[in-house]
Amino acid sequence: MAEAGSGFLEQLKSCIVWSWTYLWTVWFFLVLFLVYILRVPLRINDNLSTVSMFLNTLTPKFYVALTGTSSLISGLILIFEWWYFRKYGTSFIEQVSVSHLRPLLGGVDNNSSNNSNSSNGDSDSNRQSVSECKVWRNPLNLFRGAEYNRYTWVTGREPLTYYDMNLSAQDHQTFFTCDSDHLRPADAIMQKAWRERNPQARISAAHEALEINEIRSRVEVPLIASSTIWEIKLLPKCATAYILLAEEEATTIAEAEKLFKQALKAGDGCYRRSQQLQHHGSQYEAQHRRDTNVLVYIKRRLAMCARRLGRTREAVKMMRDLMKEFPLLSMFNIHENLLEALLELQAYADVQAVLAKYDDISLPKSATICYTAALLKARAVSDKFSPEAASRRGLSTAEMNAVEAIHRAVEFNPHVPKYLLEMKSLILPPEHILKRGDSEAIAYAFFHLAHWKRVEGALNLLHCTWEGTFRMIPYPLEKGHLFYPYPICTETADRELLPSFHEVSVYPKKELPFFILFTAGLCSFTAMLALLTHQFPELMGVFAKAFLSTLFAPLNFVMEKVESILPSSLWHQLTRI
């Protein structure tokens, strides 16, 4: 019985919702008809005549004040709507209408009735949204002391945001520290240094950690009863201190490379010792994991130093050896460094081999993967590609493959072509990127623009075909073609990662909400009316009367027809019934 009663109530509620949704026009005409029937007892004609007499007695100054006040109010609403749209990306009036008025009218019933069936799909989409909005470490990030700080000295601008540097500090604490650091004085100092916000304080702490390691401990070893000898024993060097100095204090890449080589000696020794002791307990295992991260980081940065200094083949060899030695550490994305170095060597066959391994459906994509694949496909046809010839004879199979690869890359990250085609100026890439966002596009184009320019006709092919991607995905936030729908969170995250002097690229381009345009038009129209009424009161009065008479002419015509059809004694007959 309870189920039957609840089912009846749900059916009744759905009928009411349906009537509100589709029959509001019928209800509106019924109300008008009822008002017409009750016009005599309600004395509507007398009230209207009283109102018209009151309006006729008003002076033009009243209308000027009225229109001026309306213009002021609509202008304030416009300013508030524009501010809310710039900050939150949506209209305040639309949000209030959807959030509060729509539930009152039953607009969410259809979704709530299917909640139990779609809970799994919602959780999957939420997980996908979280993974797409994850911030990643930039595998091609620059050196703070040798590159970012030099930019600041020259331009006076800060290329890194506080949010970006805070993420780097968290990464350093994750990779370079462990729970047993308090047992070694140098590591304890570095544990505090990674949390320090002031760069000079971090550098001073790194020097302090190295000075502690210079202390020599003496161990007394008795050789004979009458004499003793003192053995000098050096404490192990602190590799993370050298890392910090190489990253932040070194002003050139050559200086950074020297410090990283010293860090490599210290880090390699710590790694070998912890490798032998890793099975003795969880504490030793954590130390070995930390030492592994330190060693991989040092070798990767040494390879990047070699790449910066022009020793590209040496850098490629170091990266290949590192990937073979530590194949499971994919968090550093060393293959992206390798792809960039191989493109510099123009070793396109090796690039294709790396792509065959990492451009897999089960692995996370990146702009480097997608656009490098598109570059290789474009390289095969770009030197002979002509848009006029292609429009006459159609695209060949190779050209079609190249265009599809470009469309795939543009769908993954639609911000990259503007930087590759130099439609937008580049800045220094941040230390962290958001995949499919503007930050990733900057990081990719900063290092790969030269590789696209080196391939003859590649940028021309990109220029002719990249905008065609958007015709395939008219609603990118709702449905994608080859990838998941474009995440909504990219603009907010990119504004946190990129400096304020950079204009963040937004996709899809947001159109102004209807209510902003409406309030802008209303504000302008009422202000114009106020000005005209103040300047030409008599003429505007004549115009207003003519406008109102024209506006109400159809209604008066309908009322006359209704009065001619219905008998004059209808209300009297209805009261008798």
Swiss-Prot record:
Ranges annotated as spanning the membrane: 15-35, 62-82, 512-532, 539-559
Keyword Transmembrane helix: yes
Positions where Phosphoserine occurs in the chain: S386
Residues bearing carbohydrate: N47
Taxonomic path: Eukaryota, Metazoa, Chordata, Craniata, Vertebrata
The encoding gene: St7
Membrane topology reported for the UniProt record: Multi-pass membrane protein
The name this protein goes by in its record: Suppressor of tumorigenicity 7 protein
Pfam assignment, any one: ST7
Family: Belongs to the ST7 family.
Subcellular location: Membrane
CC terms in the record's Gene Ontology section: membrane
Organism: Rattus norvegicus
Database matches in InterPro entries: ST7
Keywords of this entry: Glycoprotein, Membrane, Phosphoprotein, Transmembrane, Transmembrane helix
